[in-house]
Amino acid sequence: MSGSKAKSRELARDVALQAIRTLYLAAVDAVRRGDYELARRLVAEADETRRVMRLRKPRFLRRGVCRNCSLPLVPGVTARYRLVRDGSVTRLVVTCLACGYIHRHVLVQRRRGSR
């Protein structure tokens, strides 16, 4: 790949990521106003932009959107966040208040016995 072609691809990738972030933030604002359908459409548009550009899903889309109902997860509005300690593992448990789907993310996994 030539240098200018790689640069233009990188520039297009950066512009697409900015557009995806802007759409996600607009979806979060729509949820705070109570317009859930607009928020879903904005998230779908952000995901479509990501697919067209063949990008990995950014972390804020992986963790900030419900997999079941495609609604942005806003603490206290559409999501409940809890920390659960289970033996040697600490998990972040996010419950979508719109559909009830439960997301579990491992935060800390402590090792036993090794010093």
From Swiss-Prot:
Disulfide bonds: none annotated. The keyword Cell membrane does not apply. Its cofactor is Zn(2+). It catalyses: Endonucleolytic cleavage of RNA, removing 5'-extranucleotides from tRNA precursor. It comes from the Archaea. GO terms for cellular component: cytoplasm; ribonuclease P complex. Its main location: cytoplasm. It is found in: Cytoplasm. Zn(2+) binds at residues 66, 69, 96, 99. Keywords: Cytoplasm, Endonuclease, Hydrolase, Metal-binding, Nuclease, tRNA processing, Zinc. It is an enzyme of class 3 (hydrolase). One of its GO terms (biological process) is tRNA 5'-leader removal. GO terms for molecular function: ribonuclease P activity; zinc ion binding. Consists of a catalytic RNA component and at least 4-5 protein subunits. Part of ribonuclease P, a protein complex that generates mature tRNA molecules by cleaving their 5'-ends. This is Ribonuclease P protein component 4. It comes from Hyperthermus butylicus (strain DSM 5456 / JCM 9403 / PLM1-5). The gene is rnp4.
